[in-house]
């Protein structure tokens, strides 16, 4: 049973997140291992396994990029374990340049430049994310898979920039 079916939701990217949360809570109550404490060992094991599946499904469906990857996996794209990556050389060059810029910002400890960088990367991510949503809605799976691969790069870059932001904040607070 796929995660969408488990939660009684249509297999599409855009979800009713409130319905997802409510269904998660219902499933947690229904299959909580403590409810099966007096059951047979097989029932206890089944409850633990079902609970683990519910938690994994919840983590996957509530995170937008993971949900997109999962939806694509249902259509034959195993992005989590695939070997090939983005083939768009212009995009890859842009990523290298952005990484170099982030390194320069770190060396200079330039908080204002970092703030501007983070905003720029967020805008790039949001633009590609909107494109991905349209591609998934239109069931253009190949294009959506390519966009998800690019979003992974941007997500990692954004995460690195936010970690640097925390590091610079700690540096400024400690004064060293």
From Swiss-Prot:
Lineage of origin: Bacteria, Pseudomonadati, Pseudomonadota, Gammaproteobacteria, Enterobacterales
Protein name: Co-chaperone protein HscB
InterPro entries tied to this protein: DnaJ_domain (IPR001623), HscB (IPR004640), HscB_C_sf (IPR036386), HscB_oligo_C (IPR009073), J_dom_sf (IPR036869)
Protein keywords: Chaperone
Protein purpose: Co-chaperone involved in the maturation of iron-sulfur cluster-containing proteins. Seems to help targeting proteins to be folded toward HscA.
Domain J: 2-74
Record's GO cellular component terms: iron-sulfur cluster transfer complex
One record GO biological process: [2Fe-2S] cluster assembly
Pfam entry (one): HSCB_C
Quaternary structure annotation from Swiss-Prot or TrEMBL: Interacts with HscA and stimulates its ATPase activity. Interacts with IscU.
NCBIfam families referenced in this protein's UniProt entry, alphabetically: hscB (TIGR00714), PRK05014.1 (NF003449)
GO terms, molecular function: ATPase activator activity; protein-folding chaperone binding
Spans traversing the lipid bilayer: none
Similarity comment: family membership: Belongs to the HscB family.
Superkingdom as given in the UniProt entry: Bacteria
